[in-house]
Amino acid sequence: GGNELNVDYGGQSRRLMITVPKKLGRQGTHPVLFCFHGAGGKADGPSRRWSPHADKRGLIVISAEAVQPLAKWNFRDGFHAEEHDDVGFVLKVVEALISGKLADPGAVYATGHSSGGLFCYRLAKQTDVFAALSPMSCGMVKGAHDPDAKTTPVPILQVIGDQDKSFKGSSNPKVTMYSAARRMEVWRKFNQCAARPEITGQGEELEVHTFTSPSGMNVVLCKAKGQGHFLRSDLRDKADSLALDFLLKHRKS
């Protein structure tokens, strides 16, 4: 069922919408999916989108909300007019779920749209609690999101429309966003994946490029042909299912 929770963190009341599978607690811990809304959004939208998978996949689905009214995830320090420790907030929730014997510590995942997808790249770089992440319809910030010596290799699946403004990358005085191809290259190299991807189709309009390392680490680009920042609903549903398949096949050791 669904629950709404407000958590005090960093002097702010932070809103979570949590959907748990009917079998919660009967079979020990469960995989957890965090989902992050786009700029100006609320937790309700991603909750409606992802919560149906709670029972289907035995997942705890957590739709987190950025501090209102700005409602933008802190994907890079110094970018927004006001800043909040969103990374620390998410890590606190993960810690509580694991210590409460609800979350499987080897199966914590994240996805997000637009601003939420950018935030996923920050989590991929700065944290080591996620088994895999799937940023969607977003860019990746040059410098801020490049993995470094402190980053743990992690599987990533990027879903993006080839007509999305972020697909080809962008640059302005405040921020440079990598193209989809360039960010795949950055994470492919870091995860020690082969240079040549396996290319498969999910119907005519979804093209999947999978880069794999000898140890089985993946970096994947799911390109939605002819689609912009918001995928057509049937394609979005198909991409979401593909993303969940990808996420759940990975475990953090």
Label the predicted regions.
Residues 24-71, 142-143, 166-168, 230:
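Short substrate-entry loop that stabilizes the transition state in hydrolases
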Residues 228-235:
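Catalytic histidine-centered segment of alpha/beta-hydrolase-like enzymes
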Residues 165-179, 232:
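Conserved alpha/beta-hydrolase "acid-adjacent" motif
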Residues 151-156, 215-219:
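Short, proline-enriched alpha-helix->beta-strand connector loops that line the catalytic pocket
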Residues 158-160:
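Short beta-strand/loop motif that positions the catalytic acidic residue
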Residues 79-101:
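Alpha/beta-hydrolase active-site loop
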Residues 1-32, 56, 78, 82, ...:
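A domain-start/cap signature at the N-terminus of enzymes
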Residues 65-85:
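Cap/lid segment of the alpha/beta-hydrolase catalytic domain
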